[in-house]
Swiss-Prot record:
Its main location: cytoplasm. The gene is argH. Disulfide bonds: none annotated. Pathway: Amino-acid biosynthesis; L-arginine biosynthesis; L-arginine from L-ornithine and carbamoyl phosphate: step 3/3. GO terms for cellular component: cytosol. It is found in: Cytoplasm. PANTHER family: ARGININOSUCCINATE LYASE. One of its GO terms (molecular function) is argininosuccinate lyase activity. One of its GO terms (biological process) is L-arginine biosynthetic process. Pfam families: Lyase_1. It comes from the Bacteria. This is Argininosuccinate lyase.
Length: 432
């Protein structure tokens, strides 16, 4: 391992202890490396503004940071176990290439605000991807709701047949859910969009750092003012980001549950594209919906990441090394969550309903609610109408059709009035 940034002269570092301290940081930091480089460039510019670096030194640092980013992207530079973390790797490279200019880059900052700013930039990008994917999923659902508005589908409560519903209603429900998920992700971007660079280890420094410049240069909406809060916000912002992701993966879990049921032989309402299924290693007849099952499992990983960070935050104010573990939680949580969400738009666009199976699952009792409401409209007190309809449920469907039931469902949002124009307007607002 290269020289440790914090190592004191004459003090030997035990290899086992150092391995424990570093953990899997150097692997996780590959996620944050390019963001750390971008923040280092902005920090160097700020140092030049206050006279710590000359224009020549700034030019050399900026050039070498750009080269390091290019080498990392191409694979010419590998962030591996010879470095303690991404911060050490950047400083080692700059010192090797530039000498004292590289040794000056850390003036006025700590690895604490380095990882804070890199993480904030990373979280902004990941949350924007959650918002984009949620909007894509909502658009697929809106398009299919429009195209299949009148397709009868059995509606369930308690996983028991309940009323006549429609594919349009089913799709519209998921469209609105993922519009909300996109809004929540965008709102969370606004929360985390604050610049902690320049807060150092949580108490500021005796330098007039140009924090306004780094805020603008890195594209942050505002300055995170208090160095104390900068440390308090670590974990808190990660938790908020995972909650926004979890809102999307929670709905993903529920839609995957629907599809798990609907693709089973007992329902057979839906056929999945072949590429979303696998076979059995022993049963030649099997076509397993493994993709949607693993989608369903994804929320567990996101929830676990949330729980891990929540437990880490049982701490007093100030920096604590415990917080290092928050990196693994967000990397794993967002890694699993986004990978699953990426697959959902195409899956939803290509699934096929089986209208004959859907119609066969609509039985006479599913019209009983219609009968009760119609009697109430005619003047029968609803509770009496309810009792009468319950007693005659087995014959409630006589003379009725699924299409007739759907056409009568005129309450706003129901099958005859899906209000897709309202949802479309909300979807359009996401892109504004």
């Amino acid at each position: 391992m290269t020289n440790l940034l914090w190592q004191k002269p004459g003090v030997a570092v035990d290899a086992k202890i150092q391995s424990f301290l570093a953990g899997d940081d150097v692997i996780l930091d590959r996620e944050f490396f390019l963001y750390d480089i971008a923040a280092s460039k902005a920090h160097a510019q700020g140092l030049q503004h206050i006279g710590i670096l000359s224009l020549q030194e700034l030019g050399g640092l900026s050039e070498q940071l750009d080269l390091l980013a290019a080498d990392f992207r191409s694979g010419a530079f590998v962030l591996d176990a010879q470095y303690e973390d991404c911060h050490s790797a950047i400083e080692a490279r700059l010192t090797e290439r530039l000498g004292d200019a590289g040794r000056k880059i850390h003036t006025g900052r700590s690895r604490n605000d380095q990882i804070l700013v890199a993480t904030r930039l990373w979280l902004k990008d990941k949350l924007q991807r959650v918002a984009t994917l949620s909007a894509e999923i909502a658009k697929v659902a809106l398009d299919r709701a429009q195209a299949e508005a009148g397709l009868p589908v059995p509606g369930y409560t308690h996983i028991q047949r309940a009323v006549v519903s429609s594919a349009g209603m089913w799709w519209a429900g998921w469209a609105e859910a993922f519009i909300d998920n996109a809004v929540r992700a965008d709102d969370t971007v606004r929360l985390v969009d604050s610049n902690p660079l320049g807060t150092a280890a949580g108490y500021g420094v005796n330098l007039p750092l140009d924090r306004a410049h780094t805020t603008a240069e890195l594209g942050f909406a505002r300055l995170l003012v208090s160095p104390i809060y900068a440390q308090l916000s670590r974990g808190k912002y990660e938790l908020a980001a995972l909650e926004a992701l979890g809102s999307a993966t929670l709905d993903l879990r529920r839609i995957a549950w629907d599809l798990s049921l609907f693709t089973s032989g007992e329902f057979a309402f839906v056929a999945l594209p072949a590429q979303y299924t696998t076979g059995s290693s022993i049963m030649p007849n099997k076509r397993n919906p493994d993709v949607i099952e693993l989608m369903r499992a994804t929320h567990a990983s996101v929830a676990a990441a949330r729980t891990e960070i929540e437990q880490l935050l049982s701490l007093p104010s100030g920096y604590h090394r415990d917080l290092q573990s928050s990196k693994g939680a967000i990397v794993h949580g967002f890694g699993r969550g986004l990978a699953a969400l990426e697959l959902l738009p195409a899956l939803l666009a290509n699934l096929e309903w089986r209208p004959d199976k859907l119609r066969a699952a609509i039985d006479s009792g599913m019209y009983a609610t219609d009968v009760a409401v119609e009697a109430a409209v005619a003047g029968v007190p609803f509770r009496e109408a309810y009792k009468a309809a319950a007693q005659a449920a087995e014959t409630a469907g006589q003379g009725r059709t699924p299409e007739g039931s759907l056409a009568a469902r005129v309450s706003p949002g129901a099958a005859a009035d899906l209000q897709l124009d309202v949802l479309q307007a909300r979807w359009q607002a996401l892109r504004a």
